[in-house]
Amino acid sequence: PIFMNISKERCSDTAYAVQQQDKLADLSVYFTEDELSRYVDSYIQEGYFNQDGALYLFPVAKSTEITMINKTDWEPFAEATGTTVDELATTEGITEVAQRYYEWTDEQTPDVPDDGKAFYGRDSMSNYFIIGMKQMGKEIFQVKDGKMTLNTDEDLIRRLWDNYYVPYMKGYFASLGKFRSDDVKTGDILAYTGSTSSAVYFPDTVEIGNKSYPIDYIVCDSPVMEGGENIKVQQGAGMAVTKSDEEHEYAASVFLKWFTQKNQNLRFVCESSYMPVLKEANSVDALDSVIKENNIEVNQKVYDCFTTEMEDFDKTSFYTIGAFDNSYSARKILDYSLADKAKADKDAMDAAIADGESREE
């Protein structure tokens, strides 16, 4: 039997918990080194929970993060201020552009002070911490043999703080709906960073009160901390095989090989909005060939995310934290600690502004 867990975050957390009960089969005995070498290295490495060489989790479809922009409302701002999409390549660049957008929108109503609009939001704060730190050369959760060491650096954490909490408090960033794509739809932000697998949910219209208008979009890479390495988050789906007799475990491994072969896997990801797991499948040529041969209709937003990531694939490293006890809870602390504080403090500040204080006060 196959244990399957598809997640936009961490399927390895669930698989690790089952493996701790000694219930997962070691898949490495059913794959040759040559076979495993065809898969994206970091995807395979995620399945090695210990230093014993046993492979417990096999990748079947992955995702990472991208930035999507409301092109329709971006263009007037960009033209008026000389801002370019290239400025969004770094986390610090996004902060600078967000400030510029806030000030530009504030200027549209000179008789109303401090009413500028937020530019940006992000779906996953844990990814912001984990990937931001890794881009700057540190692992916030350093894991070895299932044991985690919390590895913080005050200067690096300060950089993350300065590029989320500070702009959030100043009104440059926002997080109002359940997801940031919701905030784009309501016109509360112009751009956000989120999972490639969620691209299909980027809205086709903005709805503000009784007003609604269609929007186009821009897809670009997720930002890198200034001066940091081009590292992106690795998340998505994997399969693990529960322990059984050799015949059933072998049959499960044959299925995994079939399901992840180039053509089959690309057909699946085109319909699920995930990324393929073989190195050779992560190319625009391979994608286009499978789409044409099988007459597949792919959502245009999903296709644009695929091509954006595939064009940069060979220059990108993917990263996810190793599995450890309570790793899911640890990620949730990162997800909510800074975000909740920023929201609570911002609400308090907005109330003070409503009572007559200026934003700077």
Q: Which role does the model predict for each range below?
A:
Residues 26-39, 83-89, 113, 119-120, ...:
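Short, solvent-exposed loop/beta-turn-alpha elements that line the ligand-binding surface or hinge
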Residues 11-19, 196-213:
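A ligand-binding cleft/hinge motif common to bilobed small-molecule-binding domains
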Residues 1-10, 186-195:
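Alpha-to-beta junction loops
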Residues 2-66, 214-223:
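Hinge/lid segment of periplasmic solute-binding proteins
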Residues 47-67, 92-149:
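Extracytoplasmic/periplasmic solute-binding protein
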Residues 296-361:
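Conserved C-terminal helix/tail region of periplasmic/extracytoplasmic solute-binding proteins
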Residues 95-102, 143-177, 217, 222:
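Glycine-centered hinge/linker elements that transmit conformational signals in sensory
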Residues 158, 169-170, 207-282:
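Extracytoplasmic/periplasmic substrate-recognition and gating elements
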